[in-house]
């Protein structure tokens, strides 16, 4: 019998796919954890303050977490950090990494992140001024004017700083193409603003932990990053020589320990990749995001996602890629956690992130971006066990470190938690961190 009243966890996720997995993961703890939906709890904003000894955890969408209660009480927990724009906002993360590598030139981030420029533009008429801050990009486009072979051109990729799910991403290699892309974005922005003014005067709507939804005009903030495009990606004959990226699930816990979940995913583009091809509008060859692929004709989930460890590569190469990913992630969290204005960790919070990596033909791994509240459903039904395993590992971490008292944990429960956390690999632990 438990020596204290059980902790309560309120699970309220918008995606039924995730909600069901979480309820099952918490349900394994039986009477040790009182798991409820928001409806069952009786109030979406309840803090459980009626019992001072009771522990309460919000496992919810970011916008639904009662941040006041999480901040006030050490016995109220959350599945997200309140401030983490330094990680999930592409421009802010690029800025933090730039600061970090200036102080730590030996860091793996000097090589493990594509060359990145922060690009801000309020009006297309000021493109010249904006490009002055991205001199190397302008030089690359000027160089390309005299290069007829697309394979020999310098290529770049434009990404909105705030959006997720592949929205608003374009590959370009000339000034003319960049202008066309930006003009289209500014036009769609104006149209969307007119619609939003009629529907909602409150401003930006968000989803996925503060990110703009993919259906919105992606340039409302008018902040992008430009990255040097990795135009020689690793291609596998067993997968039709299609470009792919690696989705890595990461758990950040407390203040601050970071774990990588070993079972990573490989997400493939639907069309074969040909470096010599000049069609940069062929998203089916260049972009690997399954949210975009689902809109294309002939989308086949079984061909879009595979297990990283099942890829047709020698084991030593897979191990080499995984080791790079772990080291890159360790230094990434070291970089962002040193900038407290844009990334603050609380001892009573944990958070799941999805990181995307690309591997080049020489098996060098590059971190592309980080996503809060990753789109777990893109894993699909065939590989659902990967999400289930990561959720079980995350729940076990929350149970052991936050929710359960040591004298309430039997040997069987401890074995279950150890088993569920077995595939978490620690990649970073902040020095002088506050205790759980």
Give the label of every model feature segment.
Residues 359-436:
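C-terminal active-site "lid" helix and adjoining low-complexity regulatory extension at the edge
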Residues 3, 10-164, 171-184:
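Conserved N-proximal alpha/beta basic substrate-recognition cap immediately N-terminal to
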Residues 15, 19, 23, 86-97, ...:
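Generic preference for well-ordered alpha-helical elements
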Residues 71-75, 309, 368-376:
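Short acidic (Asp/Glu) and glycine-rich catalytic loops that position anionic groups and cofactors
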Residues 63-71, 298-306, 367-369:
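Active-site-adjacent bridging/hinge elements
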Residues 11-16, 79-87, 106, 168-171, ...:
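Amphipathic alpha-helical protein-protein interaction segments
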Residues 355-357:
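Hydrophobic residue at the +6 position relative to the catalytic HRD Asp in the kinase catalytic loop
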Residues 147-154, 161-350, 362-364, 394-397, ...:
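Catalytic core of tubulin tyrosine ligase-like
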């Amino acid at each position: 019998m438990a020596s204290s009243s059980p902790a309560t966890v309120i699970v309220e996720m918008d995606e039924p796919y995730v909600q069901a997995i979480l309820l099952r993961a918490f349900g394994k703890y039986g009477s040790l954890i009182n798991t409820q939906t928001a409806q069952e709890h009786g109030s979406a904003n309840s803090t459980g303050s009626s019992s001072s000894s009771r522990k309460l955890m919000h496992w919810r969408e970011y916008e639904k977490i009662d941040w006041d209660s999480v901040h006030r009480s050490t016995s109220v927990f959350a599945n997200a950090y309140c401030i983490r724009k330094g990680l999930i906002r592409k421009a802010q993360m690029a800025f933090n990494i730039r600061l970090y590598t200036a102080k730590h030139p030996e860091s793996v981030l000097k090589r493990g992140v594509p060359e990145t420029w922060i690009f801000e533009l309020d009006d297309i008429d000021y493109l010249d001024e904006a490009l002055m801050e991205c001199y190397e990009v302008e030089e690359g486009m000027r160089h390309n004017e005299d290069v007829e072979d697309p394979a020999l051109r310098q290529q770049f990729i434009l990404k909105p700083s705030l959006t997720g799910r592949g929205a608003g991403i374009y590959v370009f290699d000339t000034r003319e193409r960049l202008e066309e892309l930006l003009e289209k974005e500014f036009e769609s922005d104006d149209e969307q603003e007119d619609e939003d003014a009629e529907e909602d005067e409150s401003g930006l709507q968000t989803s996925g932990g503060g990110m703009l939804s993919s259906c919105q005009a992606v340039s409302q903030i008018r902040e992008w990053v430009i990255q040097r495009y990795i135009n020689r990606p690793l291609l596998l004959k067993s997968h039709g020589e299609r470009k792919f990226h690696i989705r890595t699930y990461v758990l950040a816990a407390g203040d601050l320990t970071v774990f990588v979940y070993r079972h990573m995913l490989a997400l493939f583009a639907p069309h074969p990749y040909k470096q010599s091809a000049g069609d940069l509008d062929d998203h089916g060859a260049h972009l690997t995001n399954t949210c975009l692929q689902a809109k294309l004709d002939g989308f086949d989930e079984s061909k879009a996602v595979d297990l990283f460890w099942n890829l047709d590569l020698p084991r030593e190469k897979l191990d080499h890629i995984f080791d790079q990913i772990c080291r890159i992630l360790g230094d990434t969290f070291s970089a962002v956690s040193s900038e407290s204005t844009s990334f603050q960790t609380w001892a009573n919070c944990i958070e799941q992130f999805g990181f995307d990596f690309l591997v080049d033909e020489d098996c060098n791994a590059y971190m592309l971006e980080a996503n809060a509240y990753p789109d777990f459903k893109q894993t699909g039904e065939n590989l659902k066990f990967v999400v289930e395993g990561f959720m079980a590992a995350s729940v076990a971490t929350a149970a052991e470190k936050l929710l359960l008292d040591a004298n309430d944990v039997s040997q069987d429960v401890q074995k279950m938690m150890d088993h569920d956390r077995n595939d978490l690999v620690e990649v970073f632990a902040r020095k002088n961190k506050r205790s759980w």
